[in-house]
């Protein structure tokens, strides 16, 4: 289906990377959109072409209600009153992913989930290129999808957040994957977790092949399941499964051994799961199995994802700053084997999530919890006997450096977004690395 944007009043919301990519997309088509940003001083303002009309400081602008088409950036809530009003007036509101999906003719692999998206998407990109594909990776990983549009592409791999899926309606994926679904971004969704979950599930709606995590109870009745192929991974009853009867878990397809985890660089059950689903995707795409295995054996952690920064004098320092929700902290804790104390750095903006699920884990572990940031005081009350509130990350690292002993593991796995003290999880992780080098 061909979309004609000429003659339409087009408005872009947000001057981040996504917003800039949308401007460039329309300009290439000979169309001049308008753009609004809530900030009075957006960091990308300098990138706005001089001939583009803009408004800063508020979304409550008449332009919204005068538009024919609004392209909304993922950082802006779809549930703002003025946007609800715009929908009621029949104004079309879409994401950059929707624009992208209208342009693409080659296969798309869509990857979403609460945790692990960037790791799996990067694995698949490497496997695809190893297999001879001209593959492009974009989306939530930091490269807007409109920037990777290429007439010569064989394959697109896109990482998708729930925010990006909210206003995406015609994404026809060759393969769609939900890695996992756990509580996150609850403050974004008026109807709570189920609304967040349903948004994630929408990735399957127009997919040919749906890969599902058997450990998550996904109601197939919520998905338009006509003419779909379903592939499962996770538990013993899955198509792709992990057998954990030995110290080194083994990955299977049906009853056939694929890979022993002792052969790979990555560590931790969550990483074994990432490798498992990557094998499922690769097989579904009919990539040569040997290419996939060779890539996965040599794959190392992406920055800020359970990244071992230092391992000296019997002390491990692990940077898991990408942990922005409670489930990812839980996974990180379950991946640590140590005879000493786990010294956990927890804190930031909890996004109204329920951290009480960590209570039982804290009780069973030899652990000291250093809570910092916006919700640090609240988090320190989850397990008061083992917790201490520290104002910021630097003070926490200084304190830990004085208390740490041989055999201990220091883990930055905040379980929260970085808002309040940092611009993003990368800035938080980089400061942690810098502090380790300076203080320890």
From Swiss-Prot:
Amino-acid positions noted as binding ATP in the UniProt annotation, renumbered to this chain: 113-119
Subcellular location, record wording: Cytoplasm
Record field: catalytic activity: UDP-N-acetyl-alpha-D-muramoyl-L-alanine + D-glutamate + ATP = UDP-N-acetyl-alpha-D-muramoyl-L-alanyl-D-glutamate + ADP + phosphate + H(+)
Any single Gene Ontology cellular-component annotation: cytoplasm
Its EC number(s): 6.3.2.9
GO molecular function, one term: ATP binding
Any one GO BP annotation for this protein: peptidoglycan biosynthetic process
Disulphide bridges, residue numbers: none
Keywords: ATP-binding, Cell cycle, Cell division, Cell shape, Cell wall biogenesis/degradation, Cytoplasm, Ligase, Nucleotide-binding, Peptidoglycan synthesis
SUPFAM superfamilies, per the entry: MurCD N-terminal domain, MurD-like peptide ligases, catalytic domain, MurD-like peptide ligases, peptide-binding domain
Pathway listed: Cell wall biogenesis; peptidoglycan biosynthesis
Primary location recorded for the protein, binned into one broad class: cytoplasm
Source taxon at top rank: Bacteria
Function, in words: Cell wall formation. Catalyzes the addition of glutamate to the nucleotide precursor UDP-N-acetylmuramoyl-L-alanine (UMA).
Family to which the UniProt record says this protein belongs: Belongs to the MurCDEF family.
Name the UniProt record assigns to this protein: UDP-N-acetylmuramoylalanine--D-glutamate ligase
